[in-house]
């Protein structure tokens, strides 16, 4: 599920971002990370990441659920290709996409969706809720953040089997929206991180979390949204995330009314 925008010679957003230049995460060191999988034939396939935000709600990217598929969420996973013994499998009962999301215009923003699970997961040391930032919270430039996911480990590469993490310091809006970076493609409802040309998200990381260290604890400040169509790890084209703090009231309203 690779969504391409325009030609590869232009710096246009490409959704489905995966971790490039990362390392294998410690087993269950990011216990709010989930794998969003769809059924095709008799098999299940990882398509996106997500964050467990309630025992029966997951936050992901809207572009991950643009297609009518039968989805399930796997919590507590580390190696997608084997049984770790810690996984919890739950079907997705309802999908709520942000009403302003337009799949033909990723750069407009609103790339966020909430998934209500058919039943609540059990919280333990392998499965925990992600901590969300306060509404309107803005990261300082160069804040320490990690992207996590099972996405491709290089442009046009293979999906990772074990959860990967990469250190991606945040890039503030003033820099990220400058002409030598993303320009007007990036909006102030987005978070940019990385851009060193080595480490980035890539296809398959989409929808997953950007964990940032603020006041001594990690919270999920981003939902992985897009990278450059020229490649995942392009210098001065940081990975772009939906800014979670811009959607806190929407998230709370959706959960309260569903």
From Swiss-Prot:
Q: Where in the cell is it found?
A: Secreted
Q: What is its EC number?
A: 3.4.21.36
The superkingdom listed in its UniProt entry is Eukaryota
- Enumerate the GO terms in the molecular function aspect: metal ion binding; serine-type endopeptidase activity
Q: Which residue pairs form cystines in this protein?
A: 48-64, 145-212, 176-192, 202-232
Q: Which UniProt keywords apply?
A: Calcium, Disulfide bond, Glycoprotein, Hydrolase, Metal-binding, Protease, Secreted, Serine protease, Signal, Zymogen
Which InterPro entries does the entry mention?
Peptidase_S1_Elastase_sf, Peptidase_S1_PA, Peptidase_S1_PA_chymotrypsin, Peptidase_S1A, Trypsin_dom, TRYPSIN_HIS, TRYPSIN_SER
Q: Which residues form the active site?
A: 63 (charge relay system), 111 (charge relay system), 206 (charge relay system)
A single GO cellular-component term on record: extracellular space
> In what residue span(s) does the Peptidase S1 domain sit?
19-256
Q: Glycosylation annotated at which residues?
A: 79, 233
Q: Where mainly found?
A: secreted
**UniProt GO BP:** elastin catabolic process; exocrine pancreas development; inflammatory response; multicellular organism growth; negative regulation of transcription by RNA polymerase II; pancreas morphogenesis; positive regulation of angiogenesis; positive regulation of transcription by RNA polymerase II
Which Pfam families does the record match to this protein?
Answer: Trypsin (PF00089)
Reactions it catalyzes: Hydrolysis of proteins, including elastin. Preferential cleavage: Ala-|-Xaa
Q: Does the keyword NADP apply?
A: no
> What family is this protein classified in?
Belongs to the peptidase S1 family. Elastase subfamily.
Cited function: Serine proteases that hydrolyze many proteins in addition to elastin.
Q: What is this protein called?
A: Chymotrypsin-like elastase family member 1
Q: Which organism is it from?
A: Homo sapiens
